[in-house]
Amino acid sequence: MKYSAVLVAALAAIADATIPIPKGGVPGQPIQESGKGAVFSGGTNNQLDLQNPSNIGGQPATDNGLVPNMKWSFSLSKTRMLYGGWIREQVIQDLPTSHDIAGAQVHLIKGGIRQMHWHRVAEWAYIYAGSFLISAVTEDGQFQLDKLGVGDMYYFPKGAAHSLQGLEDENEILLIFDDGDFDRVGTTFMVADWISHTPKDVLAKNFGVPPSTFDKTYNPDLALINSTISTKTVEGGNGALTGNSSYTFHISNAPEIQVPGGGGTIQVVDSKNFPVSKTIACAVVRLKPGGMRELHWHPTAEEWLYFHSGNARATVYIGGGLARTFDFTAGDAGVFPDNSGHYIENTSETEELIYLELYKADRVADVSLSQWLALTPSDIAAAAINVPIEVIEQIKKEKQYIVS
């Protein structure tokens, strides 16, 4: 008997109350454990239904009201395919709730180059596959030339001139921009695009070369190109960017923090240890199976999330009795509104969850619900949430970050 026939038979039996409804509802169907709901009888995407149980039968009873979508899968993004690799984005047109941040995945083959360019916004990056040669120049003629590997990051301030080159067979990077409307005209400026739209006699005068030098300039402009790995170094100008001025950050400078609550680790990279990163702050979070980022909120900005591996569930409380639960998997992005309350839980029994928290801010900051209750007079806190004082008195006063 085919799976669909078995499912139909099982659902019919459930409808007749001949067998109990599974805990958490019927997988892939809008049927809750309580008996609420019914089967899908029309068109539906079964794979998406199975990946998002919190939208159907698995939604908690505590969810309430109309809460906008806060999730986007990069698999739904249009992929721009080029000879040097590919690019796919999440911008505000994809996820209208993401005002502060836009994201992109960029893949470069060995020798592939992300063309020389600059932006009207800042660009931050996290490398999760391969390695890259990073090149940048400031308005003062200082330069950066650095090789970055998995876990390393960079930050280019608004207007900084830069380029990337892939150094291994396959290289992939997450780019973050501090404006959700990243595709707006006047955001990205490509050097080859500019040159191809400048009269050749002007170019000749500017660079002191014959006009024919620019006969083969790329037109239309290519964001990625094939090339060979650079063997050149850079000298002169006003010297290299180093120390607190460096645009690059090696993750070895941010050891994993074994948090008090157990259940995982956090690595924080913000302006405290990466001084140039003034508008993007990051936490790399690893949750063990069953681990949970404790109930908290962020006082400084929206939280933009990138899920690198594993599976997660999060409930977002946006005030006024409104709350919604979302399911996340590898390749998903999410955004939680400024100051909204939430948690993130690893729903796997065997696999570690790895995700990035990103903020349009100079530092990572959160307020722990548990710590707030514990550091409030216990009788007041107990009255506020209608629990015995003993419950408040046993809550740890130290921020736990992650619990298991």
From Swiss-Prot:
It catalyses: oxalate + H(+) = formate + CO2. Glycans are attached at N226, N244, N346. One of its GO terms (molecular function) is metal ion binding. Induction: Expression is up-regulated in presence of human keratinocytes. Binds 2 manganese ions per subunit. Keywords: Decarboxylase, Glycoprotein, Lyase, Manganese, Metal-binding, Secreted, Signal. The active site is at E357 (proton donor). Residues 1-17 form the signal peptide. It comes from the Eukaryota. GO terms for biological process: oxalate metabolic process. Residues 74-215, 249-393 form the Cupin type-1 domain. InterPro entries: Bicupin_oxalate_deCO2ase/Oxase, Cupin_1, GPI/OXD, RmlC-like_jellyroll, RmlC_Cupin_sf. Mn(2+) 1 binds at H117, H119, E123, H162. One of its GO terms (cellular component) is extracellular region. PANTHER family: OXALATE-BINDING PROTEIN (PTHR35848), SLL1358 PROTEIN (PTHR35848:SF9). Converts oxalate to formate and CO(2) in an O(2)-dependent reaction. Can also catalyze minor side reactions: oxalate oxidation to produce H(2)O(2), and oxalate-dependent, H(2)O(2)-independent dye oxidations. This is Probable oxalate decarboxylase ARB_04859. It comes from Arthroderma benhamiae (strain ATCC MYA-4681 / CBS 112371) (Trichophyton mentagrophytes).
